[in-house]
Amino acid sequence: MSQMLQGLRILVTQADVFMGPALCQTLAAHGAVVLADTQDLIPADAPQRMVEQHGHIDVLLVNLAMPAPSTHAGEVTEDEWQAVFDTMVHPLPRLVKAVLPQMQARASGKVLVMGSASALRGMKRASSYTAARGAQLAYVQAVGVELAPLNIQVNAIAQNFVDNPTYFPPEVQANPRFIERMKREVPLGRLVKASEDAEFAAYLCSSHADCFVGQVFPVSGGWATR
């Protein structure tokens, strides 16, 4: 295993869900000092407190997730909409705002958001979830070009059909209807392995990826290509 992340302090949010476990394992294998945090980020002051607790942060890896509601557009409640945005959207700018001063002072840093390809391709009964995921990606593109002159790279992985315990637990993967859907919709013909996704994330956290600015990279086995 390469040591391309040797000594880098990488903060991973919600490290116990979504891509958190695979990310922590892979980043550590590449030499990173992984700051695996599982704190609730919904309170408005939580992101600032988290960053202060961890001190020096070279890379902020924003891993935010919740079970995706499956609600007809005409039945989405105010509570559902608010909950999805409170969990997956509002913490993102707060985290960036909290970590930005130290990255600006060093003229160096990276932010990588683990997003969703659902924002790139329409999905039925997923309006609240895809709207939140789309907001994440729009934020990454805007902030990415703003911070690039400061040598701070902000990018996102937009994924779907990637093996993870939050969205594709074993019982889902074993469901015959899901297997047929995957064969029909995913050109790769299988789930992307968690390790494959995490290795790409590790690369984007490294100095080898300094040229990427406000980019959204689909990782979905071909389900979404742009």
Placement of each model-derived feature along the sequence:
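Substrate-binding pocket helix/loop in short-chain dehydrogenase/reductase
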Residues: 71-73, 77-85, 178, 182
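Catalytic loop of short-chain dehydrogenase/reductase
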Residues: 110-135, 140-149, 161-162
